[in-house]
Amino acid sequence: MVVVTGQSKGSGDPDEAMSSSDAEDDFQEPATPTATQAGQALPLLPQQFPEVVPLNVGGMHFTTRLSTLRRYEDTMLAAMFSGRHYIPTDAEGRYFIDRDGTYFGDILNFLRSGDLPPRERVRPVYKEAQYYSIGPLLDHLEDVQPLKGEKVRQAFLGLMPYYKDHLERIIEIAKLRAVQRKARFAKLKVCVFKEEMPITPYECPHFNSLRFERSESEAKLFEHHCEVDVSFGPWEAVADVYDLLHCIVTDLSDRGITVDHQCIGVCDKHLINHYYCKRPIYEFKITWW
């Protein structure tokens, strides 16, 4: 009897036949990558932290308890050191946070014992508290100066139409004029008025009735734009013109802009009958260097 060993049906070339060793190779389970193979792959297991945690925040070193970092559950620090996220360490084994650490000590002091920073550091610490999402610290800081006063100031400015736009316009005009004239400073005329129209008639107070009783056509006669670069107003609040001027100067100064201002008169445009526009006009001097 002759036993014939042939190729699989449909196979035309002996070289195409698959050996048993080839089949085993094809169905092998993928190997678990080693640390070398994984390169920079992060650990899959939850990260374990010691009870006392050494920190490197932007190059500044701190040490605190793990419970301090986890004091408030809904904060970035609590999430970072919950074990759910991988925190890299520096060469000395300190857990690294890529953030300027100048005010991190104030953050830790609040987490430890509820201490608030001195007044001169309230603003920058508030910014750090926003970054780390520490709600209780934000609430406390908003109730102390200068942030409490700033909250009131912003409530007033919220009544001011186009305040930020007008502020930007002052800067742009001053910059353009200084560049065009190759000058160190630039001057602008700014009108600041609280009421929609100055209603005191020029040297004729008995005409005050026009303030309340005037037709639509008469009202249009009262509508005009003073010949100035920027106008602020009107608004409805107790704060007066000088309060708004203080806001303008403060906000420009906070942006590093040197500004001086003085009242140079009033708009004297004739409106109707004995009425003249008496909006105050201020000269703003912006010094660039």
UniProtKB/Swiss-Prot annotation:
Q: Which UniProt keywords apply?
A: Cell membrane, Cytoplasm, Membrane
Question: Can you list the GO cellular component terms from the UniProt entry?
Answer: cytosol; plasma membrane
Domain of life assignment: Eukaryota
Question: Ranges of Polar residues compositional bias?
Answer: 1-10
BTB domain sequence ranges: 51-149
Q: Name one Pfam family in it.
A: BTB_2
What is the annotated localization of this protein? Answer: Cell membrane; Cytoplasm, Cytosol
Q: Which GO annotations describe the biological process of this protein?
A: membrane hyperpolarization; protein homooligomerization
Q: What is its main location?
A: membrane
Annotated region (Disordered), positions in chain: 1-35
Biological role: May be involved in the control of excitability of cortical neurons.
Q: What is the name attached to this protein's record?
A: BTB/POZ domain-containing protein KCTD7
Tell me the gene name. Answer: KCTD7
